[in-house]
C-alpha cells in the first residue's frame, strides 16, 4: 500500500517524470498534472489524493491561483508549494493561503518525502475529526 497518494503539478514534463520515478521508489502513488486547470480536474476525478505538490511558476493559472482554487474546492487536501523561483513574499502568501509547506527546487527527496508523509497524516487527522464530530451529532440526536 502506498504511503501517500500525491498529485504532482508542474509544467516541466522532464521534472514531473523524474519526480514520479523518485517518489514511486519511496512507495508514493503519484498522479501528474501539467497545469493548474488540469490539477483541479484530477482532484475532482481522484478523491483519494491526500497531498498536492504544486509548482509556483506556471503559465496560465500560476501556483498561487491554483492553491486558492484547491483550498476552496478541496479544503482538506494538503498542498506543498515547490519552486525554483522563491521569494519571501511568495512563501508568506502561500502559507497564508493554506499551504502546508514551501520548498525550493531542487528539493532533497528525503525532505520532500518527509513533508508529504507529514501532510498526509495531517489530512487524515482532519478527516478523523470530521467523522468523529458527525458521529457525535448522530449519537446526540438519537437520545
Q: Over which residues does each language-model region extend?
A:
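Short amphipathic alpha-helix used as the core "switch/output" element in two-component signaling
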Residues: 41, 64-76
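Receiver (REC) domain active-site loop signature in two-component systems and cognate sites
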Residues: 58
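Two-component/phosphorelay signaling modules centered on CheY-like receiver
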Residues: 13-32
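CheY-like receiver
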Residues: 121-143
Amino acid at each position: 500500500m502506498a504511503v501517500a497518494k500525491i498529485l504532482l503539478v508542474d509544467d516541466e514534463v522532464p521534472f514531473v517524470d523524474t519526480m514520479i520515478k523518485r517518489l514511486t521508489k519511496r512507495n508514493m502513488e503519484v498522479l501528474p498534472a501539467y497545469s493548474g486547470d488540469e490539477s483541479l480536474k484530477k482532484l475532482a476525478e481522484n478523491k483519494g489524493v491526500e497531498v498536492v505538490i504544486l509548482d509556483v511558476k506556471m503559465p496560465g493559472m500560476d501556483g498561487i491561483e491554483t492553491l486558492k482554487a484547491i483550498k476552496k474546492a478541496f479544503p482538506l487536501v494538503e498542498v506543498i508549494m515547490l519552486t525554483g523561483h522563491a521569494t519571501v513574499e511568495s512563501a508568506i502568501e502561500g502559507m497564508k493561503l493554506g499551504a502546508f509547506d514551501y520548498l525550493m527546487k531542487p528539493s532533497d527527496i528525503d525532505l520532500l518525502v518527509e513533508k508529504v508523509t507529514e501532510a498526509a497524516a495531517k489530512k487524515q487527522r482532519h478527516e478523523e475529526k470530521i467523522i468523529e464530530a458527525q458521529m457525535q451529532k448522530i449519537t446526540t440526536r438519537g437520545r
